[in-house]
């Protein structure tokens, strides 16, 4: 026999759906690159309108509504289905059918019965208004208004599917509140997200029904009564008198937890891409070896998150001016640094990849949740029955948020390890300790305070990585004996996102400081080389009588010393006898003198006799030349341009330095690190970092470089 549409024929002749368990749908949702998905999310976030139909809502659309600048439109095609379920409830009530939450009590007391359906809904809202707000201007116990907007949107989307027994007019009223930026005040705490987010959602119902304790906030932050909110939103006809089942329809859902989870995941996905790009910039400024991104390594590991993370880093590093310079340095002196970079650099794709897979999977889980019907009972008009189940159990939220938070903690841990290497002159391949940018390291401690702050952020973030969902308490007379704690987990993940933004901000400013230090290093090294060469030619080439002197052969080895020595190890006092430059330049001259043989005994051909003159001339000239080179770099007209301009990571650097106006930090300036961090953190929180971040990857074709 043949099967129609999406069915398949089994061996026994029966027909079944191709994907009856939705595993195929879940797998298909993860096709394509994570970066492409982030780009899609950003594009959706920026659209001016969200049309709700019940089944196509996305995380980015929820985040956009939460941000407050987007309008909502209800699909007119949903009206008939919503009305049908509402009518069914009323007809069922009139026939005397016994239905949970319509004629019965609630939860563990559902053995009670009543025929006063409207009064029952009113009592439901009253007893669920159990939240605590505090008094005065204290907002610490109020759910953020952005999260409330997200919850309102998700709840409308669920109710639009026509299984909930609620009037379309109520959904239109909530939509008007959203579009006029009028937000009910919901308590921050008090829900276990099973049976849904009962307590917070009851305050949306309280506003709709005009409860005297209901409060709202207007477009400019003004406090509104229910009557003022209705008038300002243009909701006509007065407060709603809830019909049977309508109160339950409003409160019996997971919208608060999944709404906040959507907001969290929108930011988390972007921060994950930022972590990939910053890891590549870290490799650039640390003079890392790019082979850690080689596709064969990651192909043999098979994990898609790792393969993509490596490919993104490979793209940033491919053709990087820093990588080219580092390769020359490694060839010149292969023993100057370890054969392999440390784990925070070399294994960053292996570390970030699984976190990205978790974040992506969680995003899809939440997208399924915000398009789910979470009521109990469900009204199945087609079969003329109410189905009692447990879709209000928000386990997908609790689990996905716990997993996401652990992934965020892992990203933060990597960031801290990378930052710790960056500021430590034992590990950072020639950058100054603390990334100090001034002339006198004894009066410039650079990012030392920032490193302490990063340790604090990382510790708190690791604590937040602990799960919420293993702290379930049996509730409501042991009826709700297992519950998801979805909103609690979402809230903790929102905290984790804020901390990761603090860490990302600090690290990003540190990377820009390192870029500028590499630029200064290159200019100063060129100046030192030119000066040493100039002095060598002047002092070492000729003897006292104008004859060629044996010391003329020392110049090449002297310049090799300059090439090999880390500039910031001596540049604050370049001619100090206790610093490595003068010591090693003298060592070169001594070694040449020892090889000079018998001619060394002759004062006119002695290289030893030239050492004092060479050092005196260098001391007279080098400090002035170094200061002049610094001044030229600071004036913005350096002899050697900043390599970052030749790199794919430049858009991010340009944004931080030019558009946000952050400065190169030194102890010579009044500006503190925290002032610059604030500029970046504010921009990051506004989403302004997205475009320069994506610009770094604009030319990536979505695949690793071919294995040559």
Curated annotation (Swiss-Prot):
PTM characteristics: Contains an active site 4-methylidene-imidazol-5-one (MIO), which is formed autocatalytically by cyclization and dehydration of residues Ala-Ser-Gly.
Keywords, ordered alphabetically: Cytoplasm, Lyase, Phenylalanine catabolism, Phenylpropanoid metabolism
Pathway: Phenylpropanoid metabolism; trans-cinnamate biosynthesis; trans-cinnamate from L-phenylalanine: step 1/1
Location of the protein in the cell: Cytoplasm
PROSITE patterns found in the cross-reference section: PAL_HISTIDASE
GO terms (BP aspect): cinnamic acid biosynthetic process; L-phenylalanine catabolic process
Entries under InterPro entries matching the protein: Aromatic_Lyase, Fumarase/histidase_N, L-Aspartase-like, Phe/His_NH3-lyase_AS, Phe_NH3-lyase, Phe_NH3-lyase_shielding_dom_sf
Enzyme Commission designation: 4.3.1.24
An example Gene Ontology molecular-function term: phenylalanine ammonia-lyase activity
Covalent cross-link (5-imidazolinone (Ala-Gly)), residues: 194-196
UniProt modified residues of type 2,3-didehydroalanine (Ser): 195
Catalytic residues (positions): 100 (proton donor/acceptor)
Reaction(s) catalysed (UniProt annotation): L-phenylalanine = (E)-cinnamate + NH4(+)
GO CC terms: cytoplasm
Domain of life according to the entry: Eukaryota
Residues that, per the record, bind (E)-cinnamate: 252, 340, 346, 376, 448, 476, 479
Main location: cytoplasm
Uppermost EC category: lyase
NCBIfam families for the chain: phe_am_lyase (TIGR01226)
Family recorded in the similarity comment: Belongs to the PAL/histidase family.
UniProt subunit comment: Homotetramer.
Function: This is a key enzyme of plant metabolism catalyzing the first reaction in the biosynthesis from L-phenylalanine of a wide variety of natural products based on the phenylpropane skeleton.
Name the record gives this protein: Phenylalanine ammonia-lyase 1
Lineage of producing organism: Eukaryota, Viridiplantae, Streptophyta, Embryophyta, Tracheophyta
């Amino acid at each position: 026999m043949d099967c129609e549409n999406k069915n398949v024929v089994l061996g026994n002749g029966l027909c079944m759906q191709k994907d009856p368990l939705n595993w195929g749908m879940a797998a298909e949702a993860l096709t394509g690159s994570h970066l492409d998905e982030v780009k899609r999310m950003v594009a959706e976030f920026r659209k001016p309108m969200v049309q709700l139909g019940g089944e196509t809502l996305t995380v980015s659309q929820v985040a956009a509504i939460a941000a407050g600048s987007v309008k909502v439109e209800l699909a007119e095609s949903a009206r008939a289905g919503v009305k049908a379920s509402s009518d069914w409830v009323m007809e069922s009530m009139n026939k005397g059918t016994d239905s949970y939450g319509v004629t019965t009590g609630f939860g563990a007391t559902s053995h009670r019965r009543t025929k006063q359906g409207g009064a029952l809904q009113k009592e439901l809202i009253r007893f669920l208004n159990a939240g605590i707000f505090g008094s005065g201007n204290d907002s610490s116990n109020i759910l953020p208004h952005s999260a409330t907007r997200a919850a309102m949107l998700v709840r409308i989307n669920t109710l639009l599917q026509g299984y909930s027994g609620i009037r379309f007019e109520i959904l239109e009223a909530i939509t008007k509140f959203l579009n006029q930026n009028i937000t009910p005040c919901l308590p921050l705490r008090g829900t276990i997200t099973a049976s849904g987010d009962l307590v917070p959602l009851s305050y949306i119902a309280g506003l709709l029904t005009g409860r005297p304790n209901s409060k709202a906030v207007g477009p400019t932050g003004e406090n509104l009564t229910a009557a003022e909110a209705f008038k300002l939103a243009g909701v006509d006809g007065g407060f709603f008198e809830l019909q049977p089942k309508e109160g339950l329809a409003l409160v019996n859902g997971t919208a608060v937890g999944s709404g906040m989870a959507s907001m969290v995941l929108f930011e988390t996905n972007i921060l994950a891409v930022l972590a990939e790009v910053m890891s590549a910039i870290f490799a650039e400024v640390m003079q890392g070896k790019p082979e850690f991104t080689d596709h064969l390594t990651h192909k043999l590991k098979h994990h898609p998150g790792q393969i993509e993370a490596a490919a993104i880093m490979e793209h940033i590093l491919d053709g990087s001016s820093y990588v080219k310079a580092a390769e020359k340095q490694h060839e010149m002196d292969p023993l100057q640094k370890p054969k392999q970079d440390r784990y925070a650099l070399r294994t960053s794709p292996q570390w970030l990849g699984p976190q990205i897979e978790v974040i992506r999977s969680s995003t899809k889980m939440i997208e399924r949740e915000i398009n789910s019907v979470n009521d109990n009972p469900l009204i199945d008009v087609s079969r003329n029955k109410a189905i009692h189940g447990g879709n209000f159990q928000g386990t997908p939220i609790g689990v996905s948020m716990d997993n996401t938070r652990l992934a965020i903690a892992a990203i933060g841990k990597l960031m801290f390890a990378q930052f710790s290497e960056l500021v430590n002159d034992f590990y950072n391949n020639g950058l100054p300790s603390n990334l100090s940018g001034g002339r006198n390291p004894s009066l410039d401690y650079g990012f030392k305070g920032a490193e302490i702050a990063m340790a604090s952020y990382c510790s708190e973030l690791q604590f937040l990585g602990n799960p919420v969902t293993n702290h379930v308490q049996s509730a409501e007379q042991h009826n709700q004996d297992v519950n998801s704690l979805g909103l609690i987990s979402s809230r903790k993940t929102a905290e984790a996102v804020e901390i990761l933004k603090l860490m990302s901000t600090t690290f990003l400013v540190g990377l820009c400081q390192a870029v500028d230090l590499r630029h200064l290093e290159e200019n100063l090294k060129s100046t030192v080389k030119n000066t040493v060469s100039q002095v060598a030619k002047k002092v070492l080439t000729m003897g006292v009588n104008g004859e060629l002197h044996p010391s003329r052969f020392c110049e090449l080895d002297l310049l090799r010393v300059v090439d090999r020595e880390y500039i910031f190890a001596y540049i604050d006092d370049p001619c100090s006898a206790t610093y490595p430059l003068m010591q090693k330049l003298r060592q070169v001259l001594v070694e040449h003198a020892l090889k000079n043989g018998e001619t060394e005994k002759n004062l006119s051909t002695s290289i030893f006799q030239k050492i004092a003159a060479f050092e005196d001339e260098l001391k007279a000239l080098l400090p002035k030349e170094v200061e002049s080179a610094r001044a030229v770099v600071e004036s913005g007209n350096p002899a050697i341009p900043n390599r970052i301009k030749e790199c794919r990571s430049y858009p991010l650097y340009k944004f931080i330095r030019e558009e946000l106006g952050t400065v190169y930090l030194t102890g010579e300036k009044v500006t503190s690190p925290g002032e610059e961090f604030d500029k970046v953190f504010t921009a990051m929180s506004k989403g302004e970092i997205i475009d320069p971040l994506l610009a770094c990857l604009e030319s990536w074709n979505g695949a690793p470089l071919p294995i040559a």
